Regions:
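Positively charged n-region of N-terminal signal peptides that target proteins for export
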Residues: 1-8
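Hydrophobic core
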Residues: 9, 13-17
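Sec-dependent signal peptide cleavage junction
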Residues: 17-31
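C-terminal edge strands of extracellular/lumenal beta-sandwich accessory domains
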Residues: 28-46, 64, 93-97, 125-170, ...
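Non-catalytic, beta-strand-enriched accessory regions in extracellular/secretory proteins
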Residues: 50-71, 116-119, 130, 174-195
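Extracellular beta-strand-rich recognition modules
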Residues: 76-78, 129-135, 200
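Extended, low-complexity, turn-rich repeat/linker tracts enriched in Gly/Pro/Ser/Thr and Asp/Glu
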Residues: 80-88, 138-140, 204-212
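Conserved small/polar residues in nucleotide/adenosyl-binding loops
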Residues: 222-224
Length: 224
């Protein structure tokens, strides 16, 4: 269950929520994959807010990369022409950790009969990111597009805020937005310099779907 959430705030306290080939590139342009982009080291570069098009052959993973110069809200869009056929692309988003290592951030099986898919908003730190695309069945041989949509904003969570030591700061009277993925706790913190009455507002868009957020407020007994 993935939904946008927000905070409004009116002793240090913590809040936990669970729920490559070289191209001359300019944002907003259109690009095409260059084979063989079959692993992260040969990933095709695509600037944020631009689209790169590719075609998966059988047993042919395609890798793409984009970079963020500073923390940003990112939505990766995977687009194609919908068809009533049995085909699927396996799309995975990774963060590059350096030294040949990368961490999975999100993934989705995108079916040909479902149409274009946009990943939920992610608040990501500056760095290099990869998108891996692998097609099966009727998805092979069909063109798709990958667009890393990016907005440089300061009011979104920054992954990976998965523990109290990496908690995102909250400012009083300001709203901060985030998205919980499966098994992805989000932590936030705010600090009081003197005793005060504080209310924490947790807001989201109402839906008839079956979902729940577990929201816990903690008092930190250590200096962080």
């Amino acid at each position: 269950m993935k939904r946008v959430l927000s905070f409004a705030l009116s002793l240090v306290m913590l809040l936990s929520i669970t729920g490559g080939l070289g191209l001359t590139a300019y944002a907003g342009d259109t690009y095409y994959e260059t084979e063989d982009n079959d692993d992260y080291s040969s990933a095709d570069y695509v600037p944020v807010n631009s689209t790169i098009y590719g075609v998966c052959r059988e047993y042919d993973p395609d890798w793409y990369k984009f970079t963020l110069s500073s923390p940003a809200k990112v939505n990766v869009q995977f687009s194609f022409n919908r068809a009533d056929a049995d085909g699927v692309w396996h799309v995975i988003v990774y963060k590059y950790d350096g030294d040949g290592d990368y961490s999975q951030i999100d993934d989705k099986n995108v079916y040909l009969y479902d149409g274009t898919y946009t990943f939920p908003s992610m608040g990501l730190p500056a760095g290099t990111y990869f998108v891996r695309v692998y097609g099966d069945y009727a998805a092979c041989g069909r063109q798709y597009g990958v667009t890393p949509k990016c907005s440089y904003v300061s009011n979104w969570e920054t992954e990976f805020n998965d523990s109290y030591t990496a908690a995102d700061p909250l400012n009083f009277g300001k709203t901060r937005y985030g998205v919980c993925r499966d098994y992805d706790p989000d932590w936030y913190k705010f600090k009081l310099n003197a005793a005060a009455t504080v209310s924490v507002s947790f807001s989201h868009t109402k839906s008839s779907a079956d979902g729940v957020w577990h929201v816990i407020v903690y008092l930190s007994l250590i200096h962080i």
